Amino acid sequence: MAERISRAVRMGIDVGGTYTKCVAMDNETHEIIGKNQVKTTHDDKSGVAAGVVKSFQNCMRENNIAPEDVVFVAHSTTQATNAFIEGDVASVGVVGVAGGGLEGFLAKRQLALKDIVLDEKVGRMIKVYNTFIKKKMLTEDVINQNIDELLNQGSQVIVASMAFGVDSMDEEMMIHNCAEKKNVPVTMASDITKLYGLTRRTRTAAINASILPKMMMTANATESSVRAAGVTVPLMIMRGDGGVMEISEMRK
């Protein structure tokens, strides 16, 4: 039996709304050496992971790629975009923070988001719940009470947003840490963007937070599928600007 020649292979996985695709490329020549496509398995008991496993393993088997050959795996997905289109989004709870006096009065109004309409014709929207804490009252106990209140109302993810939070993120970080301890997905408004005013910053964070569960589910499913195929290199996630980051970085 002829000895198998090892090679370095880069692989890419895309989980789309209709199809899950896998492409293999020679790391040295950049030649496409294999591709595979299967239907995205939304209805499988394992979710989209089943399709990822099938496409990834098919591509490796059909092109004689061994797990040890794989030096790079990148994952991209339209699942987040599809979540908006299909209304498959999480309910958001906003924990707003501001000082007292006139500043607090104005900020409280700016922080109180209404439901975010995605498709008016069919009534698709991001449900938003709000709570407000005065900055001087901000303690771990008070934060936990407010998070619990939002969760009881139906929130699935939390947004921490403070007036002038771009100048100091300590208060938003306190809320972030409390939510993390409860294993609740959380986003800090000032971490998402520092370019906009308070309302738009909070709204942007809420939109981002609403797709966190779907995004994490897809990424985790893809990572599990890659590991099940025997590939041990870190899974890289494609960013919107064309760059990549490790899945561990994305989870942060």
Where are these regions (language model features)?
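N-terminally biased helix-coil "hinge/interface" segments that flank
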Residues: 2-252
